[in-house]
């Protein structure tokens, strides 16, 4: 089931209660859209009472400074921790700095959300849907 959104694809599988998010590009000129996108993801998680998210960050480009990127990702993690989300899986990029930001954000919500990153889509899905 596709959840309507102007800026990104939110594909929800109610059978497994998994929301698939194709992560957007982040450039200085797209920051207002990125803020909107984060709000939309949080709203979808709340509205559909989603328990699992899979984000695909492999193709997204980030040109904002890492400090700004970290602030955004930390904000997302902290907002997700206020929902009933249980598991968050991420498909890895090849950017070590971005992966470090993701790991740091995950550390902010330890105990609230279980986080894992993967290189393989099938492994990520299997991890999300296991009990």
Predicted regions and their residues:
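Amphipathic, Lys/Arg-enriched alpha-helical "gate/interface" segment within cytosolic domains
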Residues: 2-131
């Amino acid at each position: 089931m596709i959840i309507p959104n102007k800026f990104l694809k939110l594909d929800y599988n109610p059978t497994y209660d998994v929301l698939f998010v194709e992560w957007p590009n982040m450039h200085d000129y797209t920051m207002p859209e990125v803020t909107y996108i984060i709000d939309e993801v949080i709203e979808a998680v709340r509205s559909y009472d989603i328990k699992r998210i899979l984000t695909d960050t492999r193709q997204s480009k980030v040109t904002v400074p890492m400090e700004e990127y970290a602030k955004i990702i930390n904000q997302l993690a902290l907002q997700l921790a206020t929902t009933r989300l249980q598991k968050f899986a991420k498909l890895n990029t090849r950017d070590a700095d971005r992966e470090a930001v993701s790991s740091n954000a995950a550390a902010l919500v330890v105990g609230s959300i279980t986080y894992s990153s993967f290189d393989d889509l099938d492994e990520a899905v299997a991890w999300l849907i296991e009990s």
